[in-house]
């Protein structure tokens, strides 16, 4: 064999592809079962999905090594950031699947294709989080995004179809921006490999050319669309509103943590240049993303839209940790999002459990504040849990998100971003108003409907609510240990 064609299998390091292959294989199995299973047993599909999610998690915990590993001719990079991203993504998916098992007759959740697409999207996101090549990141992003477009539109209702089209158009625009940004960086540095780009800029004494700055701007716009940074956020609330509550929770958590992992890899290169343009641009976007959605959320009349704007604001907090760009702040990103996912899924899960399947689709996906009026009288258990999740999302001590915000502000102050820490504190106070608005409806208003609206909960939903509530409250006792585990992954 010619020398140029010879290579070692060690260069492939194919075991790095196992997490993606597990999800892909699970999706294919689901499609096969769906073809031959005439009874359309949703519980079977969910059980198979959970089996592959648990198998994936088990592999990451047992075989995952936070020390950097390269594979597939150095196109793949599996390190602590990649492993943490996949673990958070899979934990969120597992809890959401528990909620999906509750008896709910929305048509889109009955077929095998729904859960197959969910696993395919996880495979795409895992590929995206485990790459250091701008082109392969785009490949993983598009694979996952196409699955999400289909998942949203699967119900074939007007509002769902409209949400899917908006998401698709914004996604196509983001892809265009990303491709153009990658092209500019290639023109400036001769590489689409993130490490090679960083090496080139270091050799140039971090004096980026206009092409590098332009590439940064286009990539910021593209990734900003994916994590709903202001001013690229307008699609978010409409897509959340047109999706069922659990799918909205998935979109609010999984694509964002994966994209933030990519943002850490790419933007750390630009931030290390100590360019005033890069720092001021990110600073302005951080402040706008934390503040504007908070103010808009105050005026919302639908709980799902309020949670959508809340999620956008939380993205601003996480981007602040990227801007700070220290090992401590990078650890806080995953610490914050881990705590946020349980409170957020818990809140969206209760919206899911409050659906009345006998009503029309628009009523099913709409959750006006009035719907929760007097909930403490009609369903005290869910009312107390929803209140707990609102306190957690508001960052009220000692609930989970409080610790994420506290450590984030501490990181900001340590890195001399004192004003930024003050802005975070002000926005946390503003957020408290719209979260507590729902609590007032739950406790101080008369029931919206006279009839008893007690929900019949499956054991799986009770388990999911128990997990989310437990983490939201008991994190007080595991904060330090959790942060130490995350830091071990990040620092290696």
Swiss-Prot record:
It is a multi-pass membrane protein. Signal peptide: none annotated. It comes from Helicobacter hepaticus (strain ATCC 51449 / 3B1). Keywords: Cell inner membrane, Cell membrane, Membrane, NAD, Quinone, Translocase, Transmembrane, Transmembrane helix, Transport, Ubiquinone. Belongs to the complex I subunit 2 family. GO terms for molecular function: NADH dehydrogenase (ubiquinone) activity; NADH:ubiquinone reductase (non-electrogenic) activity; quinone binding. NDH-1 is composed of 14 different subunits. Subunits NuoA, H, J, K, L, M, N constitute the membrane sector of the complex. GO terms for biological process: ATP synthesis coupled electron transport. Pfam families: Proton_antipo_M. InterPro entries: NADH-Q_OxRdtase_suN/2, ND/Mrp_TM. The chain crosses the membrane at residues 16-36, 44-64, 81-101, 111-131, 134-154, 168-188, 210-230, 244-264, 276-296, 306-326, 332-352, 382-402, 423-443, 463-483. NDH-1 shuttles electrons from NADH, via FMN and iron-sulfur (Fe-S) centers, to quinones in the respiratory chain. The immediate electron acceptor for the enzyme in this species is believed to be ubiquinone. Couples the redox reaction to proton translocation (for every two electrons transferred, four hydrogen ions are translocated across the cytoplasmic membrane), and thus conserves the redox energy in a proton gradient. It is found in: Cell inner membrane. GO terms for cellular component: plasma membrane. It catalyses: a quinone + NADH + 5 H(+)(in) = a quinol + NAD(+) + 4 H(+)(out). This is NADH-quinone oxidoreductase subunit N. Its EC number is 7.1.1.-. The keyword Secreted does not apply.
